């Protein structure tokens, strides 16, 4: 529930450093917030790689370098100090992982209120193996982001879906059934093994008309070819 009888934050730190798809959904929630509260200053803590996702939004950035400057416990404390220097007065943790927990804990000790995303892991776990019968749709991540803001006292409607604009398909005319396969991750533990990925692509190719392997550059792009 939103906080009652509390002044709304004037400068909000929003934390989401990965994964790319989750960061890409954040601007939809921010746009809904800014439409209702244009006077609220927002600083997004993320990787510089993801800045283009927020084009057209009136937000600032606090870049986080998870592999260098802000690595480990000391890095998290350093990042919290940098955030505090911006005079933020609330934190919206849209990630809720070990690093963001350390950052928000350090800021909370400074008296800065925090709000954290509820990822719905129990609901997702309960759905496994049940099929589709009698199962209600899970709450969309964008709505979960909005709820984080609402728990800080903001009150605004859910974002409106963007209007679809016709664009030419760079992959050509769609014929048959296409499927995408994304075996890679920024974290090694979440990356599907190469041999199993190759076997998965082989099996998918026998069942679908086109298989798209989503990858980054370097070795990932080489595998995708």
Regions found by a protein language model. Give the residues of each.
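Catalytic machinery of carbohydrate-active enzymes
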Residues: 1-225
């Amino acid at each position: 529930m939103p906080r009652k009888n509390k002044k709304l934050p004037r400068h909000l730190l929003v934390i989401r450093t990965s994964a790319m798809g989750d960061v890409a959904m954040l601007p939809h929630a921010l746009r809904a917030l800014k439409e209702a509260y244009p006077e609220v200053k927002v600083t997004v803590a993320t990787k510089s790689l993801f800045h283009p996702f927020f084009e057209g939004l009136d937000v600032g950035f606090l870049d986080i370098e998870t592999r260098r400057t802000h690595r480990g416990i000391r890095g998290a404390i350093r990042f919290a100090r940098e955030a505090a220097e911006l005079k933020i007065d609330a934190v919206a943790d849209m990630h809720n992982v070990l690093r963001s927990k350390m950052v928000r804990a350090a800021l909370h000790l400074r008296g800065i209120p925090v709000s954290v995303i509820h990822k719905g892991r129990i609901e997702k776990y309960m759905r496994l193996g049940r099929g589709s019968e009698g199962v209600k749709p899970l709450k969309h991540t964008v709505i979960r982001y909005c709820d984080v803001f609402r728990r800080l006292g903001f009150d605004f409607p859910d974002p409106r879906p963007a209007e679809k604009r016709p664009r030419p398909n760079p992959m050509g005319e769609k014929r048959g059934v296409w499927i995408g396969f994304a075996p890679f991750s920024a974290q090694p533990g979440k990356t599907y093994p190469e041999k199993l990925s190759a076997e998965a692509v082989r099996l998918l190719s026998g069942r679908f008309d086109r298989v798209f392997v989503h990858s980054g550059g370097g070795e990932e792009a080489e595998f995708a070819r």
